[in-house]
């Protein structure tokens, strides 16, 4: 509950207590009769007297039975006889005639009896009342005299004073005009008021104390929160993760070119913009705290870079397969301009706002709104937000003690953490059999083998590695090769539960196995970052995800989308969304050209590549899906054959023995069960070099080059022809798999 809610509740309670304390509990309010009544007839008067008498008798008996030892103040109604009897009584008593006339005049102007009012009141005990009522009306005066002689009401008042209670009213009636009774005394009303006032005072004090206590806690929490934010800012500043600039107020209010995102597609778009507009001023808004960098080396080349001292790799430099060395970042920090100086730079350039996020894009007004509400207008805008790694629901909702041992793999910070754990010889479990999961498992196995590290496990639900990309037979062969490299592959399994002990995680699998691991790395794909779609009113594809764009990669006028977050239309393969490095480069470049006025359609068939250790490397293009029918043609290598470099083609390969095999698989074949995967190369097929064709309606829609490099251009040409081939072996010869 908030502080304002507590205060409102306290005020309401005090108000109700005050109303209750000042309210008087009154008896039935006497209803006055009209000022004039018709004279009562004798029959009516006699009947009324009889009913009144019996009512009083029953009430007195009830009071006597309920409180037999109490003396009460009793209100006794007048026993005035009817008119005839009154005249007789007057004559017998010797009352003058003028008094009778005066009484008759009075009876005509006012009613003889008023409900709730008493003309004659006496204070007697319950027994006296019974005796007086049983007597005749003519003897009522002696009874009253006897009651007055005994004066029990005076005794009752004296006892009430002795017990510190307030006496009855002066006329002997009970409080509120009732029939009397100790429980209805005015003293009880005063006690009730006093208790209500004390309760209200106590509630006021308690509410004030509660408000003070909660306000104090809020102040302390706000102070602690501010202190934590300051410590986090200092930590990020030391680690190089501080926002740049420190405040969004330092960002320009208007830029010609605005890019949302700081990945490969964003930087590729900047290069295209700068190539077509030499003085272009580009502002890049990134939610990361680093300059733009490439992601593929995080799961491949960086793990094969020698680092004897296990120090953090400077600039994340790595060796390519060609032997040259380069950095993970596209450009050094000196290449970029400070956002504060972007408007003053005549030659233009690119400025990166690090650590900021965009929550809304108004395509009609050409204004973007940051999370803190700061607005920036633009002329041309590109959304290149990429995608975010998925996590297993069971691990995502786990207790904090378990989450400390669970991580995803996406950024250089994840690489640093995992490399440190591997250097400490910790056991690592990788969940997933896709590109990142399989590549990372092979890289960790190589690192562990070179440094005498811990065990590397790979757990996934499918039958074998890369089962969604490779045909079933090739997927099983790849799994065998990975196990030969030192990866403990556990297919057809998933994590049922994860429990933290003192140091490790105890993983219970659905196949009955139990693993003890120091860390779990989740690599189960990613989802496009489309949080902007709702506030910005942009369309998102329901089945594929990503922002829906046209052929020019335009979501709205002057608003483009590129990279993993774009869902584009392929004239040959239909609507697609691709999560590969080459697609990010090409789509970003095309979007940048269109932002400068080119207006070119996206017709490029992007490619991808992967490396699974020193013996397996492949490239693919088009629609590479294991659920499609496939035809594979392979050449068996010699014993002395070595791995071909990814970036250069070997034309001197000596292949004394070649064998061409054609294999066609269907969707059901790709899902065939594999109970056990052997790691013995003698028992598994040996697939050296080859090409795999993926067919749809007897047309080639995808090509996978197995240990063949620098032939992607030819594969792209074959796919773009969009034709049927009678003999795919003849098509395979174009790739020179035996060269």
From Swiss-Prot:
This is Putative apoptosis-inducing factor 1, mitochondrial. GO terms for cellular component: cytoplasm; mitochondrial intermembrane space; mitochondrion. Coiled coil: none annotated. It holds the Pfam family Pyr_redox_2. Residues 257-564 are annotated as: FAD-dependent oxidoreductase. It comes from the Eukaryota. The lineage of its organism: Eukaryota, Metazoa, Ecdysozoa, Arthropoda, Hexapoda. Its EC number is 1.6.99.-. Residues 656-676 have a biased composition (Low complexity). Keywords: Apoptosis, FAD, Flavoprotein, Mitochondrion, NAD, Oxidoreductase, Transit peptide. Disruption phenotype: Loss of zygotic expression results in decreased embryonic cell death and the persistence of differentiated neuronal cells along the ventral nerve cord at late embryonic stages. Embryos that do hatch undergo growth arrest at early larval stages, accompanied by mitochondrial respiratory dysfunction. FAD binds at residues 261-265, 295, 300, 358, 410, 564, 580-581. It is found in: Mitochondrion intermembrane space. GO terms for biological process: apoptotic process; mitochondrial disulfide relay system; mitochondrial respiratory chain complex assembly; programmed cell death involved in cell development; protein import into mitochondrial intermembrane space. It catalyses: A + NADH + H(+) = AH2 + NAD(+). One of its GO terms (molecular function) is FAD binding. Probable NADH oxidoreductase. Mitochondrial effector of cell death that plays roles in developmentally regulated cell death and normal mitochondrial function. The keyword NAD applies. Residues 1-42 form a transit peptide. It is an enzyme of class 1 (oxidoreductase). Residues 644-681 are annotated as: Disordered. Its cofactor is FAD. Belongs to the FAD-dependent oxidoreductase family.
């Amino acid at each position: 509950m908030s502080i304002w809610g507590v205060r409102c509740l306290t005020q309401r309670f005090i108000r109700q207590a005050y109303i209750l304390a000042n309210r008087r509990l009154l008896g039935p309010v006497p209803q006055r009769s009209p000022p004039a009544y018709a004279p009562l007839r004798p029959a009516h008067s006699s009947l009324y007297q009889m009913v009144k008498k019996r009512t009083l008798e029953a009430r007195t008996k009830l009071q006597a039975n309920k409180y037999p030892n109490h003396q009460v103040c009793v209100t006794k109604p007048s026993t005035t006889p009817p008119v005839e009897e009154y005249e007789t009584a007057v004559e017998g008593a010797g009352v003058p005639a003028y008094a009778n006339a005066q009484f008759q005049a009075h009876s005509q102007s006012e009613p003889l009896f008023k409900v709730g009012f008493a003309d004659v009141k006496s204070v007697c005990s319950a027994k006296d009342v019974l005796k007086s009522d049983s007597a005749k009306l003519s003897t009522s005066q002696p009874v009253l005299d006897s009651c007055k002689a005994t004066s029990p009401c005076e005794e009752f008042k004296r006892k009430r004073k002795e017990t510190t209670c307030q006496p009855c009213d002066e006329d002997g009636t009970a409080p509120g005009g009732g029939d009397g009774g100790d429980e209805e005394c005015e003293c009880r009303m005063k006690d009730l008021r006093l208790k209500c006032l004390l309760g209200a005072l106590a509630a006021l004090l308690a509410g004030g104390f509660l408000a003070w206590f909660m306000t104090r806690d809020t102040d302390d929490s706000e102070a602690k929160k501010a202190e934590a934010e300051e410590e986090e800012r200092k930590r990020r500043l030391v680690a190089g993760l501080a926002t740049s600039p420190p405040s969004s107020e330092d960002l320009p209010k208007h830029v010609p070119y605005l890019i949302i995102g700081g990945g490969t597609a964003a930087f590729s778009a900047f290069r295209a913009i700068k190539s077509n507009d030499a003085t272009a001023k580009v502002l890049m808004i990134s939610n990361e705290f680093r300059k733009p960098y490439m992601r593929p080396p995080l799961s491949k080349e960086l793990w094969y870079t020698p680092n004897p001292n296990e120090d953090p790799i400077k600039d994340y430099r790595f060796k390519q397969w060609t032997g040259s060395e380069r950095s993970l970042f596209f450009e050094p920090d000196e290449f970029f301009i400070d956002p504060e100086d972007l408007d003053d730079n005549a030659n233009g350039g690119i400025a990166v706002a690090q650590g900021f996020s965009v929550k809304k894009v108004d395509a009609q007004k050409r204004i973007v709104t940051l999370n803190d509400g700061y607005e920036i207008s633009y002329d041309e805008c590109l959304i290149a937000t990429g995608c975010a790694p998925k996590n297993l629901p069971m691990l995502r909702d786990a207790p904090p003690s378990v989450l400390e041992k669970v991580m995803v793999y996406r950024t250089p910070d994840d690489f640093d953490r995992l490399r440190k754990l591997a250097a400490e010889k910790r056991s690592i479990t990788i969940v997933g059999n896709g590109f990142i999961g399989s590549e990372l498992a092979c890289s960790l196995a190589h690192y562990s083998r070179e440094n005498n590290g811990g065990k590397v496990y790979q757990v996934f639900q499918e039958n074998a590695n890369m089962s969604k990309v490779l045909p079933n037979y090739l997927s099983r062969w790849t799994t065998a090769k990975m196990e030969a490299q030192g990866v403990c592959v556990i297919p057809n399994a998933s994590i049922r539960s994860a429990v933290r002990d003192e140091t490790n995680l105890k993983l219970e699998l659905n196949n009955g196995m139990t693993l003890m691991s120091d860390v779990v790395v989740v690599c189960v794909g990613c989802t496009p970052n489309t949080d902007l779609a709702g506030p910005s009113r942009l369309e998102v594809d329901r089945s594929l995800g990503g922002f829906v764009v046209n052929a020019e990669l335009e979501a709205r006028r002057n608003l483009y989308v590129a990279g993993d977050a774009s869902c584009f239309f392929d004239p040959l393969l239909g609507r697609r969304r691709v999560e590969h490095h080459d697609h990010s480069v090409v789509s970003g470049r095309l979007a940048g050209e269109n932002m400068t006025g080119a207006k070119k359609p996206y017709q490029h068939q992007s490619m991808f590549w992967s490396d699974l250790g020193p013996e397996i490397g492949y490239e693919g293009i088009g629609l590479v899906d294991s659920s499609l029918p496939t035809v594979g043609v392979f050449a068996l290598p010699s014993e002395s054959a070595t791995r071909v470099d990814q970036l250069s083609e070997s034309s001197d390969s000596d292949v004394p023995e070649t064998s061409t095999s054609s294999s066609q698989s269907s969707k059901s074949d790709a899902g065939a069960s594999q109970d056990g995967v052997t790691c013995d190369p003698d028992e598994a097929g040996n697939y050296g070099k080859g090409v795999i064709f993926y067919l749809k309606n007897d047309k080639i829609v995808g090509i996978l080059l197995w240990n063949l490099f620098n032939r992607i251009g030819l594969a792209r040409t074959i796919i773009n022809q969009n034709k049927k081939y009678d003999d795919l072996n003849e098509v395979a010869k174009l790739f020179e798999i035996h060269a």
